[in-house]
């Protein structure tokens, strides 16, 4: 799943500076069109990630042999975490490029507490290693919840 995230990082990197340029030119239509295009591209992730999950046990055997057993449940949560991070990056990059940082700054102060609390709670409930990934997903509430709302507001107000 790291390969998928790495490729996505290469694809998403130009968005931030391109949005900054679009904002300076008052070209909010371009931002809206880019958002739609990135969401369409993200659909490939939604299709590709489950395929990678289905192939993961086979790839693990080739990669590390039988030395370490990686549970499919752990792979599922790694996949889910990466999907959330990639989805979030679309909206966060747009907001960063537009210079809209207040909500992100506040949520970045709250997020570590949410992460630690949820991770600890899930761990004592017996979730094991996946508790870290689940906590990471929940603590990323800015990226998958607040940032999309802010992007919609940004595009509606212009």
Residue positions per predicted region:
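Helix-loop junctions and terminal segments of transmembrane helices
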Residues: 5-25, 96-97
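Interfacial segments at transmembrane-helix termini and the short loops linking adjacent helices
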Residues: 28, 55-83, 130
